[in-house]
Amino acid sequence: MSLRALTLIRDAYPDALSEQYTDRTGGAWGVLKAESLRPVLAHVKDDPQLDFKLFLSMDGVDRLQLTDNLPRFEVVYFLYSVTWKEHLRLKVRVAEENPEIPSATSIFQGANWWERFVWDFYGIRFTGHPDLRRILMYEEFKGHPLRKDYPLRQRQPLIPERPIRDIFRGPGTSGTA
């Protein structure tokens, strides 16, 4: 992974990284402060020495059962530089009291649906997101099912099935050959 990239980020933004470490596979991780997220993401995308233009994915982590006094949630970003053939993994820690961080959609359009997924399943809000609504669960769904404190046997309200528009065959076609 990219210790080189983390060094370049630290040089450009000395206060942005609160922590950096290498995991047991040799992968480099950087922990960003939430207020530094957007400037650092823009920098790693646009700086030719970094060139992390490929947004691979992002995810949420609920750390509820860990006892290390760190914030409950994390949002993890996975980026790749085709130029340098390097992966970059950045994460932002998010407090339970106000689970909210800036949106990355204006920097990486690919973050749009990933942020909706993290909102839908973990309840972490992304300020500045153009359309932050549920992506997989229906709108009436109560709670966020990947949180560790979500009750497994909770019953959800039943709603009538909604019609789905067939965008391939168009109106008035039966779909049979």
Predicted segments, located by residue:
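Terminal low-complexity/charged segments
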Residues: M1-A177
